[in-house]
Amino acid sequence: MAVKIKLKRLGKIRSPHYRIVVADSRTRRDGRAIEEIGLYHPVQNPSRIEVNSERAQYWLSVGAQPTEPVLAILKLTGDWQAHKGLPAPAPLLQPEPKADKRALFEALSSDGDEAKGEAITPKAKKSDKKADEAAEASASTESTEA
């Protein structure tokens, strides 16, 4: 039985998520898998890649052939180099930790407690043009009546 390590697509339209699976080469893309050894989320920045290195090494050692996309992922994680005995690549980029929303809220709310002065510029008053036009219109109606 020929075994392949391939990607199994999950997710919605235009929002792909993949699982890295070991499956018989004759099964369809999203068909039954022998084992799931990782996941790949390409939409996130940087892409989320998680591979169970121990299981990937096992399946590579017993002859499982990775597909081209999985081979690229295994090279990024360093599992392919470990299998072939090559030097390891640079570590993967990790996403920045998200800021604590509660601490951010408290910091902003403490800044808002300070009394702030009134507006520097006064409110704009209605323009004198509109008042002049209204006066001219009423004057012209009075002159035509006389």
Curated annotation (Swiss-Prot):
The keyword Transmembrane does not apply. The keyword Ribonucleoprotein applies. Keywords: Ribonucleoprotein, Ribosomal protein. Residues 136-146 have a biased composition (Low complexity). Signal peptide: none annotated. It comes from the Bacteria. InterPro entries: Ribosomal_bS16, Ribosomal_bS16_CS, Ribosomal_bS16_dom_sf. GO terms for cellular component: cytoplasm; small ribosomal subunit. GO terms for biological process: translation. Residues 84-146 are annotated as: Disordered. GO terms for molecular function: structural constituent of ribosome. Belongs to the bacterial ribosomal protein bS16 family. This is Small ribosomal subunit protein bS16. It comes from Streptomyces griseus subsp. griseus (strain JCM 4626 / CBS 651.72 / NBRC 13350 / KCC S-0626 / ISP 5235). The lineage of its organism: Bacteria, Bacillati, Actinomycetota, Actinomycetes, Kitasatosporales. The gene is rpsP.
